[in-house]
């Protein structure tokens, strides 16, 4: 594994873990903790980890057999998983502490449909 692979792995595990923990805290605070939902959540996290593992393996194969891939499948997959998890973490955190929803620093996470990349 390269240094980048190690950091990607750490990032994926970090975001997946934080999402799970914030989801459990949110459920506890809403008095809605369910073992069925926890099992489903763990299943989803397991699926993400398997997807990351498969992406890493594709990159390893590509190092030895030219598959013609222009970029790292692993890095792209980890980036996607981390962004999905970040969205869920933000949803959980703003339900745990509703005051954060309108906090000025949260604006950096708001999706914009206008501006230089928006429809004009």
Predicted regions and their residues:
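Membrane-interface helix-loop junction between the first two transmembrane segments
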Residues: 11-14, 20-37
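Alpha-helical transmembrane segments of integral membrane proteins
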Residues: 5-9, 46-47, 71-81, 91
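Membrane-helix exit/interface motif
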Residues: 25-29, 53-66
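Alpha-helical transmembrane segments of multi-pass membrane proteins
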Residues: 12-22, 48-56, 77-88
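Membrane interface segments of multi-pass transport proteins and intramembrane proteases
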Residues: 32-36, 63-70, 95-103
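Membrane-proximal cytosolic segments adjacent to transmembrane helices
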Residues: 82-120
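Juxtamembrane helix-capping/reentrant segments at transmembrane boundaries
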Residues: 33-48
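Membrane-helix boundary elements
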Residues: 1-15
């Amino acid at each position: 594994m390269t240094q980048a692979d190690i950091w990607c792995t750490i990032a994926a595990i970090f975001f997946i873990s934080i999402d799970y923990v914030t989801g459990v805290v949110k459920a506890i605070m809403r008095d809605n903790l369910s073992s069925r939902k926890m099992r489903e959540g763990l299943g989803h996290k397991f699926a993400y980890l398997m997807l990351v593992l498969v992406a890493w393996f594709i990159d390893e194969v590509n190092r030895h057999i030219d598959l013609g891939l222009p970029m790292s499948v692993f890095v792209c997959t980890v980036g996607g998983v981390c962004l999905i998890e970040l969205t869920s973490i933000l949803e959980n955190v703003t339900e745990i502490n509703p005051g954060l929803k309108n906090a000025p620093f949260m604006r950096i996470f708001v999706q914009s449909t206008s501006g230089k990349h928006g429809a004009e």
